[in-house]
Structures are given as structure tokens and as C-alpha cells.
Design a protein with these regions (language model features):
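Membrane-integrated ABC transporters
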Residues: 1-39, 45-100, 106, 114-118, ...
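An intracellular "coupling" helix at the cytosolic face of ABC transporter transmembrane type-1 domains
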Residues: 12-15, 142-143, 159-168, 172, ...
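Transmembrane helices of ABC transporter permease
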Residues: 17-27, 173-224, 297-310, 327
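Hydrophobic alpha-helical transmembrane bundles that constitute the permease/transmembrane domains
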Residues: 26-34, 101-112, 164-167, 171-183, ...
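Juxtamembrane helix-loop junctions of ABC transporter transmembrane domains
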Residues: 32-40, 48-51, 94, 99-150, ...
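Hydrophobic/aromatic residues within transmembrane alpha-helices of membrane transport systems
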Residues: 43, 102, 133, 137, ...
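Helix-loop-helix
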Residues: 188-202, 276-346
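ABC-type nucleotide-binding domain
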Residues: 361-362, 368-612
Length: 612
């Protein structure tokens, strides 16, 4: 990935800011040249290096750029000569000083305006990058996150984006300004003395090769550094998520030691990165000063030998302009180094942005607004890894209004089967239909709008009770929310909190008990009032009393509604219309509780094991 391709991705929406920035940078550079040009007559007056002599030339008689530049110079000198004859050299010096101040003031104004228009470009590009990354992460299928470490994804969304901001966005102004300044200065140097400029250009490739070599090693080290940052964030996330287990097993010192190894390795990597990064300024300054020394030697020899086409004052002007290139060259070198650091982070971000979803939307989706008759699993097979099938040739019809329970040992494929219905994953073979329509031909948003989901682990947000219950449901009234909470046996404990439904429940509902969190999750599904319910171990976190109350409420809710229940506790699904027993990815038994008990097979053994 090149710098140009990176800019082409993000800059187009802000092209007018770029145009204005370039315009004011060009103006400021030209004003710098004019302010430098005032030095020539000053030197000539103060040190008698030459006489100020000029002949007035009407501009309408001028043809071509070269004649125009000569005419402007002659007219400027003619004006100075006239003022010297009228008022003397001291007045001309004062006039030149005032002109220098005015030109410098205008230059400073244009520099500020150039930066003024760069600010919305920088912040806008960064906002667009964050928005694109967040949208992509939200739209990716769940399967992506089973293969990627959560800490690594978080690192790319935080550390890598921050690195892009610090290294690429902060140097965009240099990237636009410095090449313009260097180009204008070089053109001016050619106009002043093309011989000296050609001599200088012969020496530049050596400097470019040295700076480029440092930059390439910097990018490789930056990639490694960001990967190590991701490992640190992963361990922090795992530690905070499993702190109860860490303390229970006295594993604090083990984790501390592992963390120390990580941060020490990261420190060493970033030591190398920053040491190379800080080479940019001294190396470019040393090379620039070396070039000036060579230039002084070469140009001085020409002037002393009377073989030069320029006089001493013009040579000093040439040196001043050339020295002015060193500043932009150093900044450009530093910006290039910074961008190489940022490119490493941008490539890590692109791995997410360029990830293709394996849950693909239909190009011409079919309209499904309600559930009418039947859900069908037809020869469905699925595997997270190709050599380890989770579901094999599953066939199942679920009629509208039925409650179907999926039971079996851990790893038998119960939850996976439930996850296929809302297209968290797509089966490798076979199909799932709703009312005869393949769910892959339905818009994912419309498909999931038909379903309510309550997971084994209650997923709550650091927000109020009200906002957690209404999550994904718009325009719900407080009475509707309270009614859903009552059905889920949650209204009483919510009303007992200080701010009732406006009480914040903490990160992932940390201020609530496990049973309370689950009941809030159930209330959310009840409020959505979908035609299809998916209950994945929905009552497993409840105490006996709460489970009984919520189970009764869920049974009332499930009446005349299609429900798929994933359960380990078989006592909660005895009243299901159909119980499917899964074993090693296949439905090995199906029927009601009484029918399955009479078969004396897998289901009966599971029931007897739990009753013991």
C-alpha cells in the first residue's frame, strides 16, 4: 500500500479543503520568496556588493514568462533607484524593512489559513475511518469473532486508529505543504542559477536512499509493535473478564509474570521504533548542512574565479533559498517516517475493513413481513472447521405455534442449530426455509425482525433499565416496558432501585445478580413481541422461585407463538410440543416427553441422569 493510494481512499470528500490548503501554501511560499528577494538590495546597499541599477520596462511590452520576471526585477530596482536619488539610501532601507514586515505578515496569515483548512480534513478523515471500522465490525458475522481474538479487534479499533491519527493525520499538512514549498523553491533556484541547482540535484539521491532505508525498517518494526499492543489488550480483557477465576485459583502472580513479559517485549520494540523515528530530524539536518557546505565551496569557487553567472548578493540569496528547503525537507522526512508507522497500523485496520462476510445478502431479497405457517430445516449440515462437523443432515419441521425443544449433551449442536435460524451463520449444505422461502433470500434485517432471542448469558449494556429493555424496539411506552418487566418477574426489583427504570445497571449489568440480568434480557424479548422466540438456556441463571415465576410467564408468552428452546435442564421443556434429541450433530430422537420416555433411548437416559 502506497501513501498515494491511502490518500485517494480518504481525501475525496474533502477535496475542496485540500485545494484551499494547497492554494494558501503556494501563496505563502511565493511571499517567502519575495521577502527573501528584499535581502539582495539590502546587501547591496549595506555592503556595496553592487550598484542598484534598473531600467523601467512597461509590462505591456513584455512577452513570455522569462521577460516578465526580468521586467519585474528591473522595475523594482528602478523604483529603488528613484527613491535613493530623491530621499537617500536610509529611506530605501526603511522602505525595504517595512516591505519585509508586510510580506512576512501576509505570509503568516496565509500559513494560518492553510492550517485552518487542514483541520476539518484531518478530523473528518479520522471520523470516517472510525465510522467505517465500527460499521464493518457491527456488520461482520458472529463467525468472524470466533476466529479472531476480541482483544486484537479492540486494539485495531483503538490503538491502531490512534496511531493513524498520531502519525498520518498529524502529518497531512506537511505532506501537502512541504512538496509544494520544495518544488517552488527548486524552480526558483533553477531560475537564479541552473548550474548550481544541477550540481545540488546530483547529490540528493544519496540522501534519499539513506532516509528511505530507515523508513522501511521503521514500518516493519511498527507492525510488530501494534501486534504486541493487541496482545496486551487481549490479556487485559481476559483478566478483567475472568477476574473471579483468577482470584479463586490464586493465579495473580502467574498473570502478572505473563503481563510483564508482554510489556517488556513491547517496550523493547517501541524503543527501536522511536529511536529510528527520531533519526529523521538529525539525519535530514546533517545531510542538508553538508549540502550547504558543499554548495558554499563550489559556488564560492565560481564567484572568486569570475566564472559565475551570478554576483555575490544573488549567491547569498541563492543560499538563503536553498537553506529554506532544509526545513520543509526535514518536515517531509519526518512526515514520511510517521506515515510509515501509520501505514503499519492502517494495514492492520484494513484486514478488518476488507474482510468479506460469509453471510451474504441476496441481491434481490424477497419480502417477508410475518411468519405464517412453518420453519423447515432441510438436510442442514454445518461445521465451524471443515474437518469437524457440528450438524449433519438435520431435517426438522417447526409449525407455527409449536414449542420445539432442542436437548442433548454439550457439543451436540443445539445452540448452533438455533444460531442458524437468524443467520448468525449459514449452513455449508442444505437450507432453512420460512414459509417456503429460503432464509438466504430474505433480507437479514427483516428475518431477524421476526425473532426474539434470549441467550444463556444475558447481554446487557451500561445503560438504564429502560434503555436495556427497549434495546432494538422504538417508540415503546413506559407502560409497555413495565408490562414486559412484570411478565419477566423484573418489575419489583427495578422499582426498588433509587431511580427505578432510569437506574444505570453498570457494565454488562454488573450491579445486578445473575437472575436479575436474565430477567431483564427476557423482558427485552417479551417487549419485542416477535412471532418466533429463540430461548437458549433462558432460565438457567434463575433461582428456583424466580425460575418458576418466569417459566409460567414464558409459557403464557409462548402460547400461540412459535418457540425454539435450547435446554440442558430437561424439567423446563416437558410441556414442549416436540422435543428433539441431538447427538453428535444429528437428531436421533424426536417426540413429546412421554413418547420419548417410552422409547427408553437417549432422552430417557438424560432425564434419569439429571434426576439422580
Amino acid at each position: 500500500m502506497t501513501i498515494i493510494s491511502t490518500l485517494r481512499r480518504f481525501i475525496p470528500p474533502y477535496k475542496w479543503y485540500v485545494v484551499l490548503n494547497l492554494f494558501f501554501n503556494i501563496v505563502s511560499t511565493i511571499l517567502s520568496l519575495f521577502s527573501f528577494a528584499t535581502l539582495i538590495p539590502v546587501l547591496q546597499l549595506l555592503f556595496g556588493l553592487a550598484t542598484i541599477d534598473g531600467v523601467y520596462t512597461p509590462l505591456e511590452q513584455v512577452q513570455g514568462l522569462e521577460e516578465l520576471l526580468v521586467a519585474l526585477k528591473n522595475n523594482f530596482y528602478f523604483m529603488l533607484q528613484s527613491q535613493m536619488e530623491l530621499r537617500g539610501p536610509s529611506y530605501v532601507l526603511l522602505l525595504l524593512g517595512i516591505g519585509l514586515v508586510v510580506l512576512t505578515g501576509l505570509k503568516c496569515l496565509t500559513i494560518w489559513l492553510a492550517n485552518y483548512f487542514m483541520v476539518p480534513l484531518r478530523t473528518g478523515v479520522l471520523r470516517d475511518l472510525r465510522e467505517s471500522l465500527y460499521k464493518k465490525v457491527v456488520s461482520l458475522p458472529i463467525g468472524f469473532f470466533t476466529e479472531e481474538r476480541k482483544g486484537d479487534v479492540m486494539s485495531r479499533m483503538t490503538n491502531d486508529v490512534n496511531e493513524v491519527e498520531a502519525s498520518i493525520m498529524s502529518t497531512l499538512d506537511m505532506l501537502f505543504k512541504d512538496p509544494v514549498m520544495i518544488l517552488i523553491y527548486l524552480v526558483t533556484l533553477f531560475c537564479v542559477s541552473w548550474q548550481l541547482t544541477l550540481f545540488v540535484l546530483l547529490l540528493l539521491p544519496v540522501a534519499g536512499l539513506l532516509i528511505g532505508r530507515i523508513g522501511r525498517t521503521l514500518k516493519r518494526a511498527s507492525t510488530k509493535g501494534q501486534e504486541q499492543n493487541a496482545e496486551i489488550l487481549t490479556q487485559i480483557e481476559e483478566t478483567l473478564g475472568g477476574l473471579r477465576v483468577v482470584k479463586a485459583f490464586n493465579a495473580e502472580q502467574k498473570l502478572i509474570h505473563r503481563f510483564q513479559l508482554l510489556i517488556n517485549a513491547t517496550r523493547r520494540t517501541f524503543n527501536r521504533i522511536n529511536r529510528r523515528y527520531y533519526l529523521a530530524h538529525p539525519v535530514s539536518e546533517f545531510l542538508g548542512t553538508t549540502l550547504i557546505a558543499i554548495l558554499l565551496w563550489f559556488g564560492g569557487l565560481l564567484i572568486l574565479s569570475d566564472n559565475s553567472a551570478i554576483d555575490a548578493a544573488t549567491f547569498i540569496y541563492y543560499i538563503v533559498i536553498f537553506y529554506s528547503i532544509i526545513g520543509p525537507a526535514k518536515d517531509l522526512s519526518k512526515a514520511t517516517y510517521g506515515i510509515r508507522r501509520g501505514m503499519a497500523s492502517l494495514e492492520r485496520i484494513d484486514k478488518i475493513l476488507e474482510t468479506e462476510s460469509n453471510v451474504i445478502e441476496a441481491k434481490t431479497p424477497k419480502q417477508v413481513v410475518d411468519f405464517q405457517s412453518m420453519i423447515r430445516f432441510e438436510n442442514v449440515s454445518f461445521a465451524y472447521q471443515t474437518d469437524r462437523p457440528v450438524l449433519q443432515d438435520v431435517n426438522l419441521d417447526i409449525h407455527k405455534g409449536q414449542t420445539v425443544a432442542l436437548v442433548g449433551q454439550s457439543g451436540s449442536g443445539k445452540t448452533t442449530m438455533a444460531d442458524l435460524l437468524p443467520r448468525f451463520y449459514d449452513p455449508q449444505s442444505g437450507c432453512i426455509t420460512i414459509d417456503g422461502v429460503d432464509i438466504r433470500e430474505v433480507k437479514t434485517h427483516d428475518l431477524r425482525a421476526l425473532m426474539g432471542n434470549v441467550n444463556q448469558e444475558a447481554i446487557l449494556f451500561n445503560d438504564t433499565f429502560y434503555n436495556n429493555i427497549t434495546f432494538g424496539v422504538e417508540h415503546a411506552t413506559m407502560e409497555q416496558v413495565r408490562q414486559a418487566a412484570r411478565i419477566a418477574n423484573a418489575d419489583d426489583f427495578i422499582m426498588a432501585t433509587p431511580d427505578q427504570y432510569e437506574t444505570t445497571i453498570g457494565d454488562r449489568g454488573s450491579r445486578l445478580s445473575g437472575g436479575q440480568r436474565q430477567r431483564i434480557s427476557i423482558a427485552r424479548a417479551i417487549l419485542k413481541n416477535p412471532p418466533i422466540l429463540i430461548l437458549d438456556e433462558a432460565t438457567s441463571a434463575l433461582d428456583t422461585e424466580s425460575e418458576k415465576l418466569v417459566q409460567e410467564a414464558l409459557e403464557n408468552l409462548m402460547r400461540d407463538r412459535t418457540t425454539i428452546v435450547v435446554a440442558h435442564r430437561l424439567s423446563t421443556v416437558r410441556n414442549a410440543d416436540l422435543i428433539c434429541v441431538l447427538h453428535e450433530g444429528r437428531i436421533v430422537e424426536r417426540g413429546t416427553h412421554d413418547e420419548l420416555m417410552a422409547q427408553n433411548g437417549y432422552y430417557r437416559r438424560l432425564v434419569e441422569m439429571q434426576e439422580k
